[in-house]
Amino acid sequence: FAEMDKNLTETTVPKSTRFGVLVPSESKSWTSGFYPGSLWYTYLYTGNEEIKALAEKNTEKLYIETQIVRSHDIGFMVNCSYGNALRITGDEKYREPFINAAHLLTTRFNPTVGLTLSWNQSKKRPHWHYPVIIDNMMNLELLTQAHKLCGVDSLLTVAHTHAKTTMKNHFRPDFTTWHVVDYEPETGEVRMKVTHQGYSDDSAWARGQAWAVYGYTMMFRETEDAEYLAQAENVAR
């Protein structure tokens, strides 16, 4: 970690490698929280203070992501970094940015659709009106944890509603998932069910299955709603 950190700037974190060379990213990348999150877990396991210092430094690089919302990925980015920092250290300086990020995520929630918006409309995807991807299930943990901290019920309500609506529309009878379900934002009507990263529109996307298993297991842990546990078990089979 220490050697890798030497190749980073004040605003970048590792994203991947290409031909053995580190590929960094800015904080706006959806994976930006994974590096500080990995550092926090390593510190938790080892107690190494140098690792803790790296975790603190790289968590702070994501502060801007607690103040603006670019997409649903704010959950990945902030829960992995600020969420783990707060959970592991108990340092109150991480509390308000974490809670603020959760409230920002709720601004992407459309009560008519019953879901948080994944991607903003763009020239790349002009045919989608209100795309929601199964990945969003991973980002609900930001809401449930923030609800524990601040007690604002709307955070948990959004998480519940999103999970229930996803359960209704994003699964086939055999509990495989559609990657993308596009909605009409004014009515909540389903427009299409497709893939964006999987093999085909009708195939099971392995990563999507994992997102669903984690998301519904987490929702059961936080709410004790047995319907969530049953969903996680069915998806995992």
Feature roles, as predicted:
Residues 1-237:
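Glycan-recognition and catalytic cores of secretory/periplasmic carbohydrate-active enzymes
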